[in-house]
């Protein structure tokens, strides 16, 4: 293996390492979103179970106000691009559960890509080690 080939392979392995790290970060972010979505579903299900529920409304910078929510109130859902819609409890739950399914698909896809890239990375490292080992044996025999 020439030095140029080794450099090229090393660069490709570094790119794969970066990609694996990016996929790991995306996985972590998606897991966080999944937890948040599950908490939202749980909270929406709990609204109105006992008539009127007391909740904390976030005002920003860690500041909250106590408020009461009754079972008949609409739920406001952010649908992206700064837009929000009001939905009844069942429609809100349906929307949240469909979003969870989308996130699960994205998580599986990201995980599969990370695993494939990690396997390619390990294979590439083993191949590079093997090539470097053969190179050192051939050069040490010429001394």
Swiss-Prot record:
Its main location: cytoplasm. The keyword Cytoplasm applies. It is found in: Cytoplasm. Keywords: Chaperone, Cytoplasm. The keyword Chaperone applies. One of its GO terms (biological process) is protein folding. Pfam families: Prefoldin (PF02996). It comes from the Archaea. CDD domains: Prefoldin_alpha_GimC. GO terms for cellular component: cytoplasm; prefoldin complex. GO terms for molecular function: unfolded protein binding. Molecular chaperone capable of stabilizing a range of proteins. Seems to fulfill an ATP-independent, HSP70-like function in archaeal de novo protein folding. Heterohexamer of two alpha and four beta subunits. HAMAP family: PfdA. Belongs to the prefoldin alpha subunit family. This is Prefoldin subunit alpha. It comes from Cenarchaeum symbiosum (strain A). The gene is pfdA.
